[in-house]
């Protein structure tokens, strides 16, 4: 059998070993920086579609836009870190904001869809990744 041995650069190994102890502190900050980019794009797209191109005058109260937010970064049972950009559930009229957002995104009988989430996801993907990479690099350099 052939045998191969690879050695990693020493400075890289030192960074990884220092990072090991602080990943629980660093990863939430990295995810939050990426979520800010996505949230701003979703907010921009949502503002553009709410009340636009309607037959009747818009009845928008602004509750959906105010309910948009980002959850805290949390670690699931498998050890993966997650953060969510979405809507709070409570509304003054009893409906959920997720339902209203779904109706806006996909439409319903007599109401054409006005997608804002899916375009925001695809438009902000690269900038989100770049922002998170830059934040991770700055956090690793700060160790």
Where are these regions (language model features)?
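Short, Lys/Arg-rich flexible segments
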Residues: 1-84, 88-93, 98-143
């Amino acid at each position: 059998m052939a045998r191969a041995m690879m050695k990693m650069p020493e400075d890289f190994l030192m960074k990884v070993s220092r990072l090991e102890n602080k990943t629980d502190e660093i990863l939430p900050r990295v995810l939050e920086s990426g979520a800010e980019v996505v949230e701003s794009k979703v907010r921009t797209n949502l503002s553009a579609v709410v009340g636009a191109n309607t037959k009747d005058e818009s009845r928008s109260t602004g509750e959906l836009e105010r309910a948009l937010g980002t959850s805290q970064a949390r670690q699931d049972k498998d050890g993966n870190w997650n953060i969510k950009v979405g809507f709070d559930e409570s509304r003054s009229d009893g409906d959920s904001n997720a339902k209203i957002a779904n109706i806006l995104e996909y439409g319903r009988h007599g109401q054409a869809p006005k997608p804002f989430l899916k375009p925001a996801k695809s438009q902000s993907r690269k900038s989100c990744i770049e922002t998170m990479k830059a934040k991770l690099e700055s956090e690793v350099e700060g160790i």
